[in-house]
């Protein structure tokens, strides 16, 4: 999809022949299409912080990402942190704030503690992902999330434990794999990925005869 609201596509051909470029669009420009086109064309260097934070909740992902990258370029850690922890805010702005902080390599144990206890399953999951990518978990909160009631959180926590090389997670990772019962390949993958990253070769060999 282009910023003008059109769908751009080509027809696939099995031969090496060239295909024409086609576009589809509604009969007339809608107000939403015009708005998206105008916002994407704006110079975000001239927009203030509040305007950019508001755009983190826009329905168009390109606009949300553009606002996120603009806030990251300005190093707006404080504004992003406040929004990410605000439980009254909508989910998308909070997620983009967290992702922006990840881009800035922001690390803070209190911040991680707040997000790990959030009511939103997806925010907890993304907090685990954030911790894993930054290799940051000074209080060993991520292994605990392997027993989170949300499978989505368990998935992200399992992968993160591997990146963190968390020895405290070995038992919980084993439980995660066993609980998957070869019926949930996604959770099994998370558990195996976690073990491969966190366990030594000798520790992995100890699982060979696991029932």
Regions found by a protein language model. Name each.
Residues 1-211:
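Extracellular/periplasmic ectodomains of large secreted or surface enzymes and adhesion receptors
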């Amino acid at each position: 999809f282009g910023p003008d609201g059109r769908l751009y596509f080509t027809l696939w051909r099995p031969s090496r022949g060239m295909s024409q470029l086609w576009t589809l669009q509604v009969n007339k420009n809608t107000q939403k299409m015009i708005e998206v086109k105008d916002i994407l064309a704006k110079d975000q260097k001239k927009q203030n912080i509040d305007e950019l934070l508001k755009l983190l909740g826009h329905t168009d992902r390109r606009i949300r990402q553009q606002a996120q990258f603009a806030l990251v370029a300005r190093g707006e850690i404080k504004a992003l942190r406040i929004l990410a922890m605000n439980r009254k805010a909508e989910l998308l702005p909070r997620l983009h704030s967290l992702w922006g902080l990840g881009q800035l390599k922001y690390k803070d144990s209190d911040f991680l503690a707040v997000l790990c206890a959030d009511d939103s399953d997806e925010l907890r999951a993304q907090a685990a992902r954030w911790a894993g990518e930054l290799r940051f978990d000074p209080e060993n909160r991520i292994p605990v999330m392997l027993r989170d009631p949300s499978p989505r959180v368990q998935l992200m926590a399992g992968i993160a434990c591997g990146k963190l090389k968390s020895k405290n997670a070995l038992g919980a990772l084993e439980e995660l794999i066993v609980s998957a019962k070869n019926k949930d390949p996604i959770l099994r993958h998370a558990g195996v990925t976690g073990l491969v990253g966190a366990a030594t070769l000798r520790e992995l060999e100890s699982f060979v005869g696991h029932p």
